[in-house]
Amino acid sequence: MTAMTRKARPAGLVAIDREMARQRSDALASYRQAFESAAKVAASLKKTGRALLLGMGGSHAVNRAVEPLYRDLGIDAVALPLSEQLGQPLPLTGKTVLISSQSGESAEVVRWFSETGGTADTFGLTLEGGSFLARTATCLVGAGGTELAFAATRSLTVTFALHLAILAALGQDPAAAFAALEAPSEIDVEPALAALRKVATVVTSGRRLQGVAEALSLGLVELSRRPCFSLEGGQLRHGPMEMLGPEIGVILFRGDDATAGLVTAMASSVLEAGAPVVMFDCSSAAPVEGAVTLRFSPASGMAAIFAMLPVAQRLMIAFADERVENAGTPVRSTKITRSE
């Protein structure tokens, strides 16, 4: 009799596992240690009333996710890739600039400061206290140090916690977000994995939670090396519906907010086109028949983000592990992107 052998966990995924195992504790510690810097950022935002959120990769996805949360507090917030700001810059006068970079060493970060010199209202969010960004600007520094594994997991959660500190300093109640962070969901991702097993491409989409959708699509691409991309719900509706079919998997994010009905309508349309749908659902609405629904307690904003994010991370890792032998070990990229 030949004993069945299990596939060894790839080294890259083991490294990600280590990051994820401490992301909640690091996020909580990051929030608690950020009070002083968060108060400075909040004071600047109250003075300017405008925020320019700059970052690359996963940092930009975080910025997209928190963009509506700042707007809810009356801040005119705009999130742009830092590369776009370098090439087609928005004016900086009268704005609070928040630059996010987990390493604090990205090529775009270094060039931006070299070309602009920064401003008195420029702040950073990073995981590395000794980085270029931390040395150059007043920074909120996350706990736990630099994320070593490829594909952002802990760095996303920690950066969200740093933003939560700023939002709390602006007057937002962090209680619901804390509750979601302290009690992670153990939702089984296998039904979602099964629904996506035969797809060649994944599209992620949301409305107010579009930033989370973008973070997941980036992780899926990095780990699975399959084409995965994200379209905001309205943008998906305007033309790209033509691509839908059984080989295109669609992952939707629905929160307990005013845009939930639009996400529901999109799920129905995608199913009518014959494409499998996975729904990350923090809404109070009924599940969409035919969609695989990962159901969370009703939540919106940062509470929904903290509830959904670790489950989305587990899904992207499992999706990649089924398709790539050495998932988590990059073949064309590096953890810190030092070139443009």
Regions found by a protein language model. Give the residues of each.
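Active-site-adjacent beta-strand anchor residues
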Residues: I99, G206, I305
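Active-site phosphate/pyrophosphate-binding segments
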Residues: G12-G49, C139-G249, T259-A260, R323-E340
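Phosphate-moiety recognition in structured ligand-binding domains
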Residues: T2-I16, A137, S269-E340
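Short glycine-/small-residue-rich flexible loop motifs, especially phosphate/cofactor-binding loops
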Residues: E67, S217-L218, A267, I317
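Residues within well-formed alpha-helices
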Residues: V62-V66, V212, L216, V311
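Glycine-rich phosphate-binding loops that contact phosphosugars or nucleotide phosphates
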Residues: K46-D188, M241, G249-P298
